[in-house]
Structure formats: C-alpha cells, structure tokens
Amino acid sequence: MMESTRKGCWGEERVLRLLRRRGWQLVSQRWSCRYGELDLVLEKQQRLLVVEVKSRRSRGLDLWGLSAFNKGKQLRLKRAIGCWLATHPYFAEHSLELVLALVPLPPSRNTLDWIRIDDLDIDAAD
C-alpha cells in the first residue's frame, strides 16, 4: 500500500471513530464515481455529514492539507455528492453538511481541525 494511501486510511479511521462516539452512523466510506471519491458519509437524525479527510505529517503552511482543498476539488466533491444522492434516494430529504477534517500525523495530542464548507447547492446527478 502506498504511503499516501496508508495516511489517508489512518486519518479516515481516526475521524470515523470520533464521529461514531458522537452518535453518527457510517453510510458510505471511500465511495467513488466519475467525479471523485467521498471519504466518509455519515447519518444521524435525518442529517447527512460528508467528510473530506486530509491527513498530513506537519501543519506548516499547508495547514494539514487545507491547500489541497482548492476550488476544483470542491467542485468535484459537490458533483460526487450529487451522484451519491442520486444512487441513495432514501437520503434525499436529509439535511446535508460538508466538512473538511484536517488530521495531523503521526498520532499525537494534536486535535483535529474541522472546517465547515458552506454554500452547498447540490442536486442529485446521474
């Protein structure tokens, strides 16, 4: 397994454990379509939480991966969410929130940084 894939999986698992402790239930993990991949999709009380996980070894100028979440990535992610909703119609009436989880590596006492992504205008796409 490539180093970046291991880091990504470790970061996703760390975020998933935390969210499960907070009552969220996993619906999809590493779901992909032609637009890209959704790292985590979770559900709780008629709410959907889509989490894009960025794991980095150092915070530095990159802020643990924040610079990788550019406008192009955001557009692809929103399109992927539309595809996911089209293939999971049961969740169409759920409210939707997209967050970016910035995970420091290696494991440390550093907390996760959560950034809520606003302005979601997503329609189910094919």
Curated annotation (Swiss-Prot):
Cited Pfam families: UPF0102
GO molecular function, one term: nucleic acid binding
HAMAP family: UPF0102
Family the entry assigns: Belongs to the UPF0102 family.
Protein name per its UniProtKB record: UPF0102 protein P9303_16141
